[in-house]
Swiss-Prot record:
Record function comment: Plays critical roles in virus replication, from virus entry and uncoating to assembly and budding of the virus particle. M1 binding to ribonucleocapsids (RNPs) in nucleus seems to inhibit viral transcription. Interaction of viral NEP with M1-RNP is thought to promote nuclear export of the complex, which is targeted to the virion assembly site at the apical plasma membrane in polarized epithelial cells. Interactions with NA and HA may bring M1, a non-raft-associated protein, into lipid rafts. Forms a continuous shell on the inner side of the lipid bilayer in virion, where it binds the RNP. Determines the virion's shape: spherical or filamentous. Clinical isolates of influenza are characterized by the presence of significant proportion of filamentous virions, whereas after multiple passage on eggs or cell culture, virions have only spherical morphology. Filamentous virions are thought to be important to infect neighboring cells, and spherical virions more suited to spread through aerosol between hosts organisms.
Species whose genome carries this gene: Influenza A virus (strain A/Swine/Wisconsin/1/1967 H1N1)
Gene: M
Cellular component terms (Gene Ontology): host cell nucleus; membrane; virion membrane
Upper classification of the organism: Viruses, Riboviria, Orthornavirae, Negarnaviricota, Polyploviricotina
One Pfam family linked to the record: Flu_M1
Keywords tagged on the record: Host nucleus, Membrane, RNA-binding, Viral matrix protein, Virion
InterPro entries per UniProt: Flu_matrix_M1 (IPR036039), Flu_matrix_M1_C (IPR013188), Flu_matrix_M1_N (IPR001561), Flu_matrix_M1_N_sub1 (IPR015423), Flu_matrix_M1_N_sub2 (IPR015799), INFV_M1 (IPR037533)
HAMAP family for this protein: INFV_M1
Entry protein name: Matrix protein 1
Length: 252
């Protein structure tokens, strides 16, 4: 796996699923391929994106700044600086300085990532802030190692929290989660269907599913009534794709 592929993988792992994730993935691909060279416009676009947490925006801003060639005097962005200040905790800053000194001795991406993984996400973000604010310099490869270690820490905690929700025995939470998943699947179906004639059927199924979820929420239904909703939708989507000549076995 190439270095940039690895960086893209780690960074996207902390971005919530949805149309915005696809957009960010495209931007990262363009940046890494050298197709997008306007850092100013890129940062302005990133700053105004909804849904993303300040830290995620900070990490993406850091990656864009590392990758896109820019004039030396280009102003650092406040939204990135604020996100990478380790919550203003002096403890994080102390650890960040220690980590920075260790990173200075590293020359490889994997070496830097290994060193960084033993620190908390707050200290890692502060260390990124040091480099972003030009208080310290490391090679791009080492900086990417730091980015990936930070994303791994964040993705780990997100995964734990997600697993807790998926394995919860509370029927109300499970019910709501199934309805949310069915709703987002329906939305994705509508987007994929496009405007072809054969799409009418898929659109109809998606629309009915969304109306059903809306009705279930309005009148309040038994928690088990949502079981299988998303799977039914995905089966419909696969059947539609088969007719369109598209075979995607790994949807579930």
């Amino acid at each position: 796996m190439s270095l940039l592929t690895e960086v893209e993988t780690y960074v996207l792992s902390i971005v919530p699923s949805g149309p915005l994730k696809a957009e960010i993935a495209q931007r990262l691909e363009d940046v890494f391929a050298g197709k997008n060279t306007d850092l100013e416009a890129l940062m302005e676009w990133l700053k105004t994106r909804p849904i993303l947490s300040p830290l995620t925006k900070g990490i993406l801003g850091f990656v864009f700044t590392l990758t896109v060639p820019s004039e030396r005097g280009l102003q650092r962005r406040r939204f990135v600086q604020n996100a990478l200040n380790g919550n203003g905790d002096p403890n994080n800053m102390d650890k960040a300085v220690k980590l920075y000194r260790k990173l200075k001795r590293e020359i490889t991406f994997h070496g830097a990532k290994e060193v960084a993984l033993s620190y908390s996400a707050g200290a890692l973000a502060s260390c990124m802030g040091l480099i972003y604010n030009r208080m310290g310099t490391v090679t791009t490869e080492v900086a990417f190692g730091l980015v990936c270690a930070t994303c791994e820490q964040i993705a780990d905690s997100q995964h734990r929290s997600h697993r807790q929700m998926v394995t919860t025995t509370n029927p109300l939470i499970r019910h709501e989660n199934r309805m949310v998943l069915a709703s987002t699947t329906a939305k994705a179906m509508e987007q994929m269907a496009g405007s072809s004639e054969q799409a009418a059927e898929a659109m109809e199924v998606a629309s009915q599913a969304r109306q059903m979820v809306q009705a279930m929420r309005t009148i309040g239904t038994h928690p088990s009534s949502s079981a299988g909703l998303k799977d039914d939708l995905l089966e419909n989507l696969q059947a539609y794709q088969k007719r369109m000549g598209v075979q995607m076995q790994r949807f579930k």
